[in-house]
Amino acid sequence: MKTRYAKRRKKLKIMVFIVLVSIGILFALFVKKNKSEHEGINMAQACKVIAYACGYQPSDGHGNYWYDEYIDYVREKQIFTDFKAKDAFTRKYAKELFSYCGVNFTEELYSYDTFSNEQFSQLIYELKDFFSSGDNLSWVEAAVVATPDMDSQLSGWSVCTDKGIYSFKGLKLSGKVDKNCVFLTCGSEILMFV
């Protein structure tokens, strides 16, 4: 009798273990899927675009990270109240940007909590006339032909497109080669993919 119950208990423990592991795997997949669906522009990327739109001229070697000088510039201008570089660009920051530009924020047009690259690009396009150097921004359709990994003649922060060579900082080029993309540029610098 005792061995029969011991065998049942062992089988039950194994089944519970399998169920718990399965639930854990499903939960991890769900979290990963939702995270990738909601990834958008972060404050470091947004500050870079906004700094260029305001006429900021970047220097070489400022800070520990590629985005330090842009964040310092935006903080100095007091465009946003409180943020971290890796924070998502949210509706709160969009309101602060509109306020900085002296434009009324329209809740209905910007109902999303976080902004994708495309949504942020549209927001910048609508505000470009309110920035001191907004007319220096361009939206260029191009295909990435080569990256520094592929061509040793390209410097570490350069990319070759079918429209010419552009510099970039803080962008991930994986998955962009041989694909038509829209870039937000300022001169020969790619600020972001749209």
Regions picked out by a protein language model, each given a short descriptive name:
Residues 172-183, 187:
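Short nucleic-acid-contacting surface segments enriched for D/E, G, S/T with interspersed K/R
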Residues 2-172:
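N-terminal propeptides
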Residues 189-194:
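OB-fold/S1-family single-stranded nucleic acid-binding modules
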Residues 163, 187-188:
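Residue-level signal for tight coil/turn positions that link beta-strands
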